[in-house]
Amino acid sequence: MKFIDEARIEVIAGDGGDGSASMRREKFVPFGGPDGGDGGRGGSVYAIADRNINTLIDYRYAKKHLARNGENGRGSDCYGKGGDDVTLRMPVGTIISDMDTGELIADLTEHDQQVMLAQGGAGGLGNLHFKSSTNRAPRQKTDGKPGERRMLKLELKVLADVGLLGMPNAGKSTFISSVSNAKPKIADYPFTTLAPNLGVVRVGPSKSFVIADIPGLIEGAAEGAGLGHQFLRHLQRTGVLLHLVDLAPFDESVDPVAEATAIVGELRKYDEALYEKPRWLVLNKLDMVPEDEREARVADFLDRFGWDGPVFEISALTGQGCEALCYAIYDYLSEHSDAHRAAEAEDLAADVRFRDAPPAKGGATPGDDA
């Protein structure tokens, strides 16, 4: 299935039904009085998080979602039937915002979490509500209220504890398949990974974390080059980033330091907050480096790259160093998870980047398929 992580939809709640102005007409009951019923309420539109869905593809092509109107009231004190609600099932991790106001409506972070997107209109009142001691046969009634109508932006950010960064063919997919049950496509050409992959890493009974692999970045990604810039948003919820570097590239003219520097630069251009996230350096493919050269090559890389943070030396293919890295990640997440989640919730509440400029008249909406 095609991975779609952004969509724009219109939700239209149902209008309330009109109240009825009716008089009781029955044999042997003179001056029966008013008996007009109320109109039914309009149906509302809800979103509900579903962990069994992992893409917004349904909403890329079905852009308008309408709830039913309430029925009008009738005589004999008959109230109109309420309109049926509409429920839209979305992946866990979906952020819903109003395109007109930029308001953050909901962040669906838990399975079965439900939120109202558009409220149905209230039903009108029948004339029986207007009867009084001075007005025994009222003709007044009220119309139903219109339902809410909204243009919404849906943005999926996968819920992962750890995110993988790196150039194409740095070994990210091999690493995630080595430490988890994820089965991403792996090949010896760039951009094998075309969509984010999630894997659950278990380090013991009831001890696990989720790791996200996104398509590799290249220089100029922040301006739209390559594929990775589309998916960097999926790293914004993570607690720590793993920057994988290929220490033994097939092409000897490729400089790992230059590639690593380019990744850091693109990260900073895209989002300063993402750049400030805790980041660990993971030097991969050590099995391809002769043992007598490893120490010198690692030292040379760290010296030229100017890195003073955590460093791990692994081989994703053979599994060397992967277990120690996973235990270190779990320990770090256990210590920092509570503070990270609280700060993330605070940042999301103040995030205004979901607000888009209105599309030009007659023009295509950004992100729509041709």
UniProtKB/Swiss-Prot annotation:
Tagged with keyword Nucleotide-binding: yes
Cofactor(s), names only, from the UniProt record: Mg(2+)
Assigned keywords, A-Z: Cytoplasm, GTP-binding, Hydrolase, Magnesium, Metal-binding, Nucleotide-binding
Gene3D superfamilies: GTP1/OBG domain, P-loop containing nucleotide triphosphate hydrolases
InterPro entries named in the record: G_OBG, GTP-bd, GTP-bd_Obg/CgtA, GTP1-OBG_CS, GTP1_OBG_dom, GTP1_OBG_dom_sf, OBG_GTPase, P-loop_NTPase
One Gene Ontology term of the molecular function aspect: magnesium ion binding
Residues binding GTP: 166-173, 191-195, 213-216, 284-287, 315-317
Coiled-coil blocks: none
GO BP terms, alphabetized: ribosome biogenesis
Subunit composition and interactions: Monomer.
Annotated family: Belongs to the TRAFAC class OBG-HflX-like GTPase superfamily. OBG GTPase family.
Protein's name in the database: GTPase Obg
